């Protein structure tokens, strides 16, 4: 009971006072006592003094304690016997009490009687308690004296109401009250209760608190109910006593209903209660809840606990950090500390409640889970989730799930989490290990928003917690990094990067943990290695102290070891680490406000360290072209992203970049001579050079020298004594040169602009007729030459894409045309050069690992696929080819260039084959910078051709043509997919190279998604221009060809390119607006800007338009394009684009109608035909669009009935190659897609219909009955289609979804029929009769599957038959329930095939008879089963689910 009252402030003070009095009154020594006894003994002849002396107590005067010469029990017994045996008993009692009253008139004497007595016995002889009771307490233990003593005390108490504490700081009223506590027996409890309540009513407030909180120790259990009622009345009258009264009520044995009333009274006052009173009140509320009302109480408590009770005032928040660091505070700091103490105490109360009451913790989680609005979520909610997660291990999974759902839905955002940590860090730091455990769990997710939340938990734990917790955070992050999981490693490194910036001094203390990651470099990617070395270098060179010097030494050791390795993978680690470290060492600190000019500038010693490190890297990599190219790329990245000190930049310009001209640039007038396999020519020059000043890139001779060096074996560079320069380094070296010049000259590239228009020493690249006569080595040489030329041009475009003069723009556009032309030429070579491996374009581990698989693995896949296809063609199958689903073309598994034959079989159209082969080679092309897409702004560009004297000789108009536009859009689309698509949507297959999806995006990966989105938003206007131009192109094309866009007069190649541009633009728009980052508040402005661009295409509006208006206008703008959509795939992207935009709107009903209407238009449109043998519409795309239509249409059942009842009969009555006139997309080839989607959506729809109850209104019953009639009618129409379309995939769909529909009928419809039968007898019987025919057909389908012995169909038969049998039983039960068994006839069925012919097989007859024997019929198509049977069936159905799905994929 005492433990429950820890929160009572008054009691704590009392105990402290008592302890103080005990200490003060302890005897100093026995010698001292004896010396003062003679002078201090009370000399009084009163009966009171005499009887006490006889019984063993000697009263003392002054400051001395009364002395107890005997044991306490012996004294009470002796005095009791003396009083009882006294001749004048019971009058002696009055005399004794009168003597006591006279004695205690003196204040010192009264005080001595209230304080404990001094023991005169030896401690060894004492068998009683170590603490002696006071005289008054001893007298209260004697029954015959107790009533009179209590009366005396209550009469004496008012004298001290308004007196301050005496000189000894002793509170007399509190001492008086304490005498009544823990009495062995209360003689008259009712009288005592009355006296106490009367005293409370007149006592001052501080004494009221003391008396009320002492009640449980004073009163017996029998008085609890009366006291409780009195206190509840007092609670209403005097709100200032709320805390002590509730504290006491929690400790009394009271009726639950009474406590409920009190609790409701308190809940109503909750919003007006002071913070310091809140812990006691919350304790009472939580202790008074029952299992039935817990959720209701907790939900109300959540709402009424305003933030002001749990969050410090704003003026206190600002000083918290100061409090943490200084450790001392002023008077205001004491107030802050008090407020924090109250909050900590509050959460201690809640922790205690949820630890011992499972219902409270579960109700609290449920209350938070039920909160839907973002604004309703509070800091208090997050703290509670953390507390329950750390306190109750059984609810961890539940909380984890709730938290993930809240994060996904955007209800819990970063700002809320930050507020939680900044305000309640003292509460949360005790749960550090649990919070880190939760963060670790969240980082294992595939959802980026959940991963980000987990990383924020680590970040804020490090920021707000103490040193020990910071160490735990770093240790946990290091564990993630060493795990090898790519997403975890990326996230953990990003957090470390933030922590290094956030609190470098704290991170320095934990640097030894980060340094340990150097032992696990094998498992992390190049981009992750960059981050790791950036963290370590920042720690090593931020401050010059002993710890940082140790890190420097270790890093130097690791880097030298890796650089000296002969394995390229380890050399790569050394190069990346060294360049990253050099960047930190040579960083430009001139703008740092904390450094003086002398310290900011790089010293000569530091500059020497940087240059020696870079020279070491250069010397260790120069023997390997790949290593050199990687070094140049890494150095270029460093210059691009980091601001280097001018001294370091100057050294780069003088040492490395000046070597470029010697290595790759020659005079254009001097044609190289040598034994080259092809004649060397200067090609692709943009200027005519008449003088000797012209330059050219010496590409073909360098490539030939490299190939010759390979073939010549050891006798390569040793004989010539010259350093071989690999053409592989051309593009990386130029990138380094360009960025260095750009940084030194503030973006001016005049020094190197000659490289933009200079020619290249090549040979005639157009193969013509000589292609077939070339040797394999010559074709490989030509392929490599074109790859290197393309990479050179791509870097040239990267360099000069942002030039503003028309001449330079024209030249860049010309180079872009050259890239497109060369890709077409390259395609011709690749098609006849099997197993060719291109030269690397990106130099990292991921690329090297995947290179061997690029050709051989895919070639093997094609060969295997070809064998399978040939086998399928030779197999005699009854499945009609028109109903067989074609698989979606998968870009991950595209065949290699070497297999031209297979390509021609699988794909039609030159563009498809070209894009396919180039896609395989994507990893070997240099990456285009995001700035390149500024070219999309170009319309018509006038280029001036100058003569030798710089006079205008002619003008040429250059424009961005469709091929160049498509080239740029494809690259931009791939970049957006890589950066903005959530990882869960692009999950790589099991055991696939983990970095394969990032190949060719290493520069892009160094930017954040926000940066990419911002860059693309700058392109929205030009992309809208291109979209409108393409729209106009197709509109004009349709008008010229009388509405037929693929008529005979159409230029096929141009048409396909424009169509592809259309698709890519829609794809880019979709990827942009589908970005999950828009849900974060900091990105809302980006969304507004993008929508404003779209809406302004229709009309110029104000920038401050509301979101709904912007969404509506944007959708209206995009909807206008639907008439010119050239392909079904474009249509699907347009629909998806509109959907992601409308998701951000609140007008859901109108939005669904818009989507459904547009989807129906696309389904009812005649699309341009592809291959004559089959539709050009992908089955997956058709499936997606049809699902969108049915999910968004107002009535799914009517839509299904229209397709199945109108479209399909039109198809049946049309010629073989024709289609439905209402739905032209419905052909015999696509029928199975329509059938599967309609069956799946029908089953999904009926599962959502609530069964209803007998208590529902008549109108509701009729509406549901009508709905089920429509559903069964649709099901009947669909089922009967298998008589016409009996291909294997159709039958499979019918078996799978037929069973699911029957299950839904049993669960959702049969309860409705139970209580609708009597009122709507005819309707119910009609419904059952229709459904009986359908289930009869399902029974025939089971027989058909068995007789054909197709295992992929027969695996569905047992579960379907069981479901049908349950239906029979359930219909019988329904008829019995309504006393009308004769209303519906149930009988046995014969086994028949789909045409209704009886199956004569004896085995099937016997098995059917056996199966039908126990049930009334084998299946006569009825309703469904008992509830027990349902559960068994469901579990069986779940086991079967996976095999169904895997088979569907193969259909």
Curated annotation (Swiss-Prot):
UniProt modified residues of type Phosphothreonine: 1426
Cell location: Nucleus
Outcome of mutating residue 1257 to A: No effect on phosphorylation by ATM
Comp. bias regions, Basic residues: 23-36
Comp. bias regions, Basic and acidic residues: 8-22
Biased composition (Acidic residues): 1428-1451
Coiled-coil boundaries: none
Gene Ontology annotations of biological process type: brain morphogenesis; cellular response to oxidative stress; double-strand break repair involved in meiotic recombination; gamete generation; homologous chromosome pairing at meiosis; interstrand cross-link repair; mitotic intra-S DNA damage checkpoint signaling; neuronal stem cell population maintenance
Pfam families: FancD2
Organism superkingdom: Eukaryota
Tissue: Highly expressed in germinal center cells of the spleen, tonsil, and reactive lymph nodes, and in the proliferating basal layer of squamous epithelium of tonsil, esophagus, oropharynx, larynx and cervix. Expressed in cytotrophoblastic cells of the placenta and exocrine cells of the pancreas (at protein level). Highly expressed in testis, where expression is restricted to maturing spermatocytes.
Primary location class: nucleus
Keywords for the protein's UniProt record, in alphabetical order: Cell cycle, Disease variant, DNA damage, DNA repair, Fanconi anemia, Isopeptide bond, Nucleus, Phosphoprotein, Ubl conjugation
Start and end residues of each stretch annotated as Disordered: 1-37, 868-906, 1396-1451
InterPro entries on file: FANCD2
An example Gene Ontology molecular-function term: DNA polymerase binding
GO cellular component, as recorded: chromatin; condensed chromosome; cytosol; DNA repair complex; nuclear body; nucleolus; nucleoplasm; nucleus
Keyword match Ubl conjugation: yes
Biological role: Required for maintenance of chromosomal stability. Promotes accurate and efficient pairing of homologs during meiosis. Involved in the repair of DNA double-strand breaks, both by homologous recombination and single-strand annealing. The FANCI-FANCD2 complex binds and scans double-stranded DNA (dsDNA) for DNA damage; this complex stalls at DNA junctions between double-stranded DNA and single-stranded DNA. May participate in S phase and G2 phase checkpoint activation upon DNA damage.
Subunit structure, as described in the record: Homodimer; cannot be ubiquitinated and does not bind DNA. Part of a FANCI-FANCD2 heterodimeric complex that binds and scans dsDNA for DNA damage. Interacts directly with FANCE and FANCI. Interacts with USP1 and MEN1. The ubiquitinated form specifically interacts with BRCA1 and BLM. Both the nonubiquitinated and the monoubiquitinated forms interact with BRCA2; this interaction is mediated by phosphorylated FANCG and the complex also includes XCCR3. The ubiquitinated form specifically interacts with MTMR15/FAN1 (via UBZ-type zinc finger), leading to recruit MTMR15/FAN1 to sites of DNA damage.
Domain notes per entry: The C-terminal 24 residues of isoform 2 are required for its function.
PANTHER family to which the protein is assigned, alphabetical: FANCONI ANEMIA GROUP D2 PROTEIN
Protein name as annotated: Fanconi anemia group D2 protein
